[in-house]
Amino acid sequence: MSQVIATYLIHDEKDLEKKAEGIALGLTVGSWTDLPLLEQEQLRKHKGVVVSVQELEENERANRYFGKRLKRGIVRIAYPSLNFSADIPALLTTVFGKLSLDGEVRLLDLTFSDEWKRKFPGPRFGIDEIRKKLDVYERPLLMSIFKGMIGRDLTYLSEQLKQQALGGVDLVKDDEILFENELTPFEKRITAGKAVLNEVYEKTGKRTLYAVNLTGKTFELKEKAKRAVELGADVLLFNVFAYGLDVLQGLREDDEITIPIMAHPAFSGALTPSEFYGIKASLLLGKLLRLVGADFVLFPSPYGSVALDKEEALGIAAELTNDKEPFKRSFPVPSAGIHPGLVPLLFRDFGIDSIVNAGGGIHGHPDGAAGGGRAFRAAIDAALAGKSLHEAARENEALRKAIDLWGAVEVTS
């Protein structure tokens, strides 16, 4: 029988076995031992089952936080798939709906049967197809971000885009807070961006993709996305957690929306940071986003300005790129506070199949965005060649200026 197994971290004063059994029954058939035998037989296939309870050592920091001594443990519960439809809202409401309001419980992971996975699309393009679009195969990709666009017009956008592309970046994305507005409306951003990037391509022979921010009311998104495709948009940036995972899946599954989708983590910080509550980042930003169809996933790096715990960040990347899953791999995009001096760390931890994403690290370069792009490309080349950044900087002025400004982290093998 197909099932979904949920893994939780639970803190509780009670016996953890009883707590787990209460969850398994409460989120499925409601009660068991007081049911007549005939009803038990009828409901058995719907009953949640405790798979395991692993009691952990007490955590003094947790006890101080809660102001009392609590037992803690890892609990795994199997939910029969026939209890809920094969969609994310039904899944999350079952395994962590009212349970998320009931005590000290954190959802760590979900394990799906192969049958259940087949109900979901995964990325339309994934890492390999995006590399084909760019004709870049043997290095991490480089992405930059529009900055300071609120209150600016299309002329400013076009020039900023041009400078970023001339610096050698592979992708440029809108700021996630750039919404529909009179100065840079959605459709005109696409057409202006396309003109600029075609001009740069004719000059340099290098392709750059532009991720335009898809925003607006939920039930208008599909038509807006289809219009973007008609206008020649390259990629859709999407603030998925402001809308819901199911909305991203709906965009992915529409056969008229034939361009990659880039998932931004905005608002996910309301769900993931606590070690006692919420959802583990590797599940929310990794496994689930890949399941519903994100081609790229942004998340905080372990060493930038909005740092995520290293284990959590690596866990997200692992879920996005695990080649044992039946889906195409999603591009991990560790972000926030990235400058050229951090490239050796990014390369060591996330490897070739990742994207180096920078905003201020591009635009804040002494030679502007084009210089920032050149500095990053030199840093990436150095990491690939096993050269130190300081050694590479002796041969590249843009990288030298970046290191003088931000410093550099050298990684020893």
UniProtKB/Swiss-Prot annotation:
Catalyzed chemical reaction(s): 5-methylsulfanyl-2,3-dioxopentyl phosphate = 2-hydroxy-5-methylsulfanyl-3-oxopent-1-enyl phosphate
S-S bridge residues: none
Swiss-Prot/TrEMBL GO biological process terms: carbon fixation; L-methionine salvage from methylthioadenosine
Textual note on the cofactor: Binds 1 Mg(2+) ion per subunit.
Xref: SUPFAM superfamilies: RuBisCo, C-terminal domain, RuBisCO, large subunit, small (N-terminal) domain
Keywords assigned: Amino-acid biosynthesis, Isomerase, Magnesium, Metal-binding, Methionine biosynthesis
Residue sites binding Mg(2+) per the record: K173, D175, E176
GO function terms (MF aspect): 2,3-diketo-5-methylthiopentyl-1-phosphate enolase activity; magnesium ion binding; ribulose-bisphosphate carboxylase activity
Binding site for substrate: K147, K173, D174, D175, E176, H264, G337, G359, G360
Pfam families named in the record: RuBisCO_large (PF00016), RuBisCO_large_N (PF02788)
EC class: isomerase
N6-carboxylysine carried by residues: K173
Positions annotated as active site in the UniProt record: K98
Entry cofactors: Mg(2+)
InterPro entries recorded: Diketo-Methiopentyl-P_enolase, RuBisCO, RuBisCO_lsu_C, RuBisCO_lsu_C_sf, RuBisCO_lsu_fd_N, RuBisCO_lsu_N_sf
Miscellaneous comment: Has no RuBP-carboxylation activity.
Family listed: Belongs to the RuBisCO large chain family. Type IV subfamily.
UniProt subunit comment: Homodimer.
NCBIfam families, per the entry: PRK09549.1, salvage_mtnW
Protein name: 2,3-diketo-5-methylthiopentyl-1-phosphate enolase
Organism: Geobacillus sp. (strain WCH70)
